[in-house]
Regions:
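Extended substrate-binding grooves/exosites of carbohydrate-active enzymes
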Residues: 2-316, 320, 326-331
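Low-complexity, Pro/Ser/Thr- and charge-rich linker/hinge segments at domain boundaries
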Residues: 8-28, 387-409, 529-534
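Solvent-exposed, conformationally flexible loop/turn segments
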Residues: 313-314, 352-357, 658, 664-669
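A short beta-turn/strand-edge loop motif at beta-sheet boundaries
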Residues: 325-332, 510-514
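Intrinsically disordered, low-complexity Pro/Gly/Ser/Thr-rich segments with frequent PxxP/GP/PP motifs
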Residues: 338-369
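Terminal connector regions
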Residues: 366-397
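Beta-strand/loop-rich accessory regions of lumenal/periplasmic or secreted enzymes
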Residues: 394-680
Length: 680
């Protein structure tokens, strides 16, 4: 048998004068940017091919991951060979999982723990990628002699690698059976390190997957998760004694079952596909990149550059930069620079050593507005940035000096503008329709929009009023939802048809940990075709089509996805999915109405434009990056939602869920600026 081997040296536990709370590979401290992973194949279930294993590890490397935890069993030989060749560290775990903890008993003899552990060690000890041995996952150490037998065996046969065990809090005897302390789902703002030994958060920042209602309502939860990892990793890297993190998990645990198969042991889904859930930080079950893949790549990036700290002076752009590689100096990288969208050219990088920082100095011509930077290692891009030097002037809407006209009948209030018309019902105290150029763009509203609390039916308790004030038509609508809460909407309509709507609650207070969105909504016709937006995004560069991009257009329909239908093998990207056979049942009326990209809430918008089919018209929300917007489709129509407050209360598992929402009645809750226009 021919076996490829490699050489490297590990220091841990304070050996040779090193720090006891750090792990060293070849003399340098390492920080593990990791993920857990299961074996998942759309064709083979839990059985993967050599090519699938290689492609998986390659995708992790592209996401700036340098470590995997083989939860909760040894991987295939193919996967370890891929890790050896691609430079991926491995925590290899014995197949002892959920034994004697969390209410689970133990039915195996101690020897049955030792046997698979010794087989794993003897099979894989020559792989240099394996740097940590794991005795088992989330188990009670003292409930069996098996775990102590594993520890004694490994210390007698391979003391060169450290040992980890989860749960360490169940250990009551000495010597401690681990050299690295395992911690699961520590809060991203919590205690991350230790002065006595390295802490590896080998289950961290769980990817959103369990609350299907949240996932079905708004795909932006995938995007929102990224801020937890970014914040958590920035704290982990600089925390003494924090070895790193392994996200849960790497690839979606979802299995597209063959048609007609009824038997299944896992029923987490609402659709026909089975599995634990869509918990992949990089790949979905079809091995497509998920939105989390780019967010993982950015959060884990070893090139740390803050565009906001860049300074342009004397024909040079000065940029502070940090090297968070463990063994790679910046001299080994290539930096490509493009000014104002021009051809990229190579720029010399300073020789910044690992875990050090310095300054980039880049020549830029006078009057340059943007500088795009791409850091390369060979042919692989590590990270990319775009630094804006001069903000382009934002176009201002031309003022209309022709005020609107108000006419009233017994049943309606009409506001006529230059190209727009608003009709309000006196009976319901609601907008009946809003037209622009003769096309109906809004069909109802405004509505108080909340998720996480049921509202009663709208009833008016006071007739609407309208009058001209300072050249605007001001319309005041009063009503309540099932008697409470009472809400007042005030619309200020300009002569060009643009308007601002303010709303406030009239009495009491309202606090609910389940609240996820608070804002207002308008009904729209069902032939919405696309949404376009500009927003303040966390990153300056995104891949084409990423749901988090700062500027973009999302089509409601992906023709190939719609034609293929429910449960089909995709020939398109994740963001263009219209059917999800894990989240939606085949007959769910909410499924198949729009793409993931279209349904995603856009946070911190400056503009959010909804376009109707055939150029019939458009509705645009204008803001100062302080609101969020999305369109919710239904079989018989659409609803434009503008949120002033939002969070994701079911992210949990150590993630940042956003601040709990509370509403004080009697105070203004918020406002939205909306423009109506002709189609483009």
């Amino acid at each position: 048998m021919c076996e490829r081997v490699g050489f490297r040296e590990i220091h841990y536990g304070g050996r040779d004068g090193t720090d006891a709370n750090k792990l060293y590979v070849n003399g340098r401290e390492v920080k593990l940017r990791g993920t857990c992973r299961h074996d998942v194949s759309p064709r083979g279930g839990r059985s993967t091919t050599a090519q699938e294993d290689w492609d998986e590890i390659s995708a992790y490397r592209d996401a700036n991951i340098n470590h995997i935890r083989t939860s909760h069993y040894p991987p295939s030989r193919h996967l370890l060979r891929a890790c050896d060749e691609l430079g991926m560290y491995v925590e290899e775990e014995n197949s002892a999982c959920f034994k004697g903890a969390n209410g689970v008993d133990i039915y195996a003899a101690p020897e049955e723990f030792l046997s698979p552990f010794t087989e794993m060690v003897e099979r894989d000890r020559n792989h240099p990628c394996v740097i940590i041995w794991s005795l088992g996952n989330e188990s009670g150490f003292e409930r069996t002699a098996g775990f102590r037998m594993e520890y004694d065996y490994i210390k007698a046969n391979d003391p060169s690698r450290p040992v980890i065990f989860s749960y360490p809090h169940t250990v009551e005897t000495l010597p401690l059976p681990y050299d690295v302390c395992s911690r699961h789902y520590e809060d991203v703002n919590g205690v991350l390190g230790s002065p006595s030994m390295p802490v590896l958060h080998d289950e961290f920042a769980h990817i959103p997957c369990y609350d299907l209602d949240e996932l079905r309502r708004d795909p932006n939860v995938h995007n929102y998760w990224g801020q937890s990892l970014r914040r958590g990793w920035e704290r982990l890297f600089v925390t003494d004694g924090a070895l790193g993190a392994d996200l849960w998990g790497g690839i979606d645990d979802v299995f597209p079952l063959p048609e007609g198969m009824e038997g299944r042991w896992q029923r987490h889904s609402q659709g026909t596909w089975s599995g634990y859930g869509e918990w992949g930080c990089v790949l979905d079950c079809w091995r497509r990149l998920k939105p989390e893949a780019y967010l993982t790549r950015k959060a884990y990036s070893p090139v740390r550059l803050d565009e906001r700290a860049a300074v342009s002076y004397g024909g040079k752009l000065i940029v502070p930069v940090k090297n968070w590689f463990d063994h790679t100096g910046f001299a080994e990288l290539k930096l490509m620079c493009a000014v104002d969208g021009g051809s990229p050219c190579k720029v010399a990088l300073p020789a910044i050593e690992p875990h050090a920082e310095g300054l980039l100095a880049i020549d830029v011509p006078e009057g340059a507005q943007s500088v795009a930077l791409s850091f390369m290692r060979g042919a692989r891009e590590i990270d990319a940035f775009c630094i804006r030097l001069k903000g382009a002037a934002r176009a201002k809407s031309a003022a209309c000096d022709c005020p609107p006209a108000i006419s009233q009948t017994r049943d309606e209030i009409c506001v006529d503008c230059r190209s727009a018309r608003f009709v309000f019902s006196r009976r319901s105290s609601q907008l009946v329709r809003a037209e622009f150029g003769g096309e109906v763009l809004l069909t109802g509203g405004p509505h108080l929009h909340v998720t996480g609390r049921e509202l009663g039916a709208w009833n008016t308790y006071r007739a609407p009023v309208a009058s001209l004030v300072d050249g605007q038509a001001v319309v005041v609508l009063h009503g309540s939802y099932g008697g409470s809460p009472r809400v007042q909407f005030v619309l200020h309509i300009n002569g060009d048809g643009s308007f601002t709507v303010e709303y406030q609650l009239a009495e009491g207070s309202w606090r609910n940990a389940e609240l996820a969105e608070v804002g207002l909504a308008f009904d729209m016709p069902g032939d919405v075709e696309s949404v376009s937006w500009e927003r303040e995004a966390p990153y300056s560069v995104y891949p084409e089509g990423h749901i988090g991009r700062g500027l973009g257009t999302a089509q409601r329909v992906c023709a190939p996805a719609l034609e293929a239908g429910y449960g089909a093998k995709p020939g398109w990207e994740w963001q263009d999915d219209m059917f999800n056979a894990f989240e939606f049942a085949p007959d769910d009326p909410a499924g198949g109405l729009a793409t993931n990209d279209f349904r995603t809430m856009r946070e911190h918008i400056r503009s959010y434009e909804v376009s109707l089919a055939a150029g019939r018209g458009r509705v645009c929300v204008k803001a100062n990056a302080d609101v969020a917007a999305r369109v919710e489709m239904a079989p018989k129509g659409a609803r434009l939602i503008v949120d002033m407050l939002w969070r994701y209360p079911h992210l949990g598992w150590g993630n940042d869920m956003g601040r709990e929402l509370s509403l004080l009645f009697g105070g203004a809750l918020g406002a939205a600026r909306i423009e109506l226009g002709a189609g483009k």
